[in-house]
Structures are given as C-alpha cells and as structure tokens.
C-alpha cells in the first residue's frame, strides 16, 4: 500500500492496483486534475474535506470511479454525485476492502448542531490496514496499521488528537 498525503485531509491510497482518493477538500489543491481514480471517498460535508467548487470536475474526469460520501455531503453538494455511505457499510474496490466506521463528527462547539462523519478502514487482503477518520475522534477500531490522523489547528486541540492517536494504537501515525 502506498499512501500519498496531498495536503490537509486529502490522501491518495494506491493498493492492489487501485487508486482511492479520500477527502479532496479546499485546503489542498494537489488532487485537482487527478485521473485514473477507482474510488473517491468523502468523510463529511465540510469544505476542507470536499471542495464544493471543484469536486464536480474531479468526478467528471473520473467517470468510472465509485463515489461515496457521508449522507449529509451527498445532500448538500450535488456536484459530488455520490451514493451515501453509513457506518457498517463495506465497499469492495478490486481487491481493496473499505469499511465505513464512526458516524459522528467531533464536537466543534456545544452550541453547534452535530453533523455526520464516516471514517474509512482501507485494507488490501491480509496486508496493511489504513484508518482515515475524517474529523471523528471517538471511533477507535483495532487492527489498524496506519492512522491518517487529523492534527491541525485551530480545529483540533493537540491533547485530543494525541489521546485519539494513542487509543487507536496504530503502528504508524501520520
């Protein structure tokens, strides 16, 4: 499995001959113009995880890609043209297994209505398992080898992020 960080929350996962893009948001531009994607996954509707201005062009340029997103993102961003994914759903992209987990975005402020968030466990056969939680800090699946952890101010407190990373117990954290 090859994992390329494209900026902020966006990563490109290449595994078992498949190319899977996660969270093409507006704080990273390296994903724009990518082609030959087999899947595009979005954890939630915030623009730093799915760029509403440019996502349509990415989807159009990858017309054969499976596009899945948390339900709120599907409804709020029509250009995403995604099918909703919920915790417990399993996708098979070639030999790559993807399981949606979580369901709740980390609390931003007690006065703000909570939104949905799905994290993704991405694995190739019996090999490496990557966990991309989006902005979920409660779901701590076991058996994770690589954690793509949200660790960015001003949205996440470093104490919360470190506690979360330790609780997942992945061999590698990035």
Task: List the predicted regions and their residue ranges.
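Structural motif
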Residues: 21-22, 41, 131-132, 148, ...
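Alpha-helix capping/helix-boundary segments
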Residues: 46-47, 73-74, 137
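Short amphipathic alpha-helical segments and helix-helix/interface helices
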Residues: 10, 52-59, 74, 119, ...
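Core dinuclear metal-dependent hydrolase active-site scaffold
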Residues: 1-35, 84-143, 154-160
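Portal/gating segments that form or line small-molecule/metal binding sites
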Residues: 55-106
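Proline-aspartate-enriched helix->loop->beta-strand connector
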Residues: 64, 158-174
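Short, glycine/charged-rich beta-strand-loop motifs at protein surfaces that mediate ligand recognition
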Residues: 148-154
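Active-site metal-binding motif and surrounding structural segment of the metallo-beta-lactamase
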Residues: 26-69, 144-148
């Amino acid at each position: 499995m090859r994992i390329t960080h494209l900026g902020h929350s966006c990563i490109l996962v290449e595994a078992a001959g498949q190319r899977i893009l996660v969270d093409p948001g507006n704080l990273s531009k390296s994903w724009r113009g990518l082609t030959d994607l087999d899947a595009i996954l979005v954890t939630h509707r915030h623009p730093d995880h799915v760029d509403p201005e440019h996502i349509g062009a990415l989807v159009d340029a990858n017309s054969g890609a499976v596009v899945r997103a948390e339900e709120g993102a599907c409804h709020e961003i029509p250009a995403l043209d995604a099918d909703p994914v919920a915790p417990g759903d399993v996708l098979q992209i070639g030999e790559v297994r993807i399981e949606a987990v979580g369901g709740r975005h980390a609390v931003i402020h007690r006065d703000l209505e909570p939104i949905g968030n799905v994290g993704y466990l991405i694995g190739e056969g019996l090999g490496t398992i990557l966990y991309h939680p989006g902005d979920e800090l409660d779901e701590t699946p076991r058996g994770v080898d690589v954690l793509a952890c949200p660790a960015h101010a001003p949205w996440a407190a470093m104490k919360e992020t470190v506690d979360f990373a330790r609780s997942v117990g992945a061999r590698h954290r990035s």
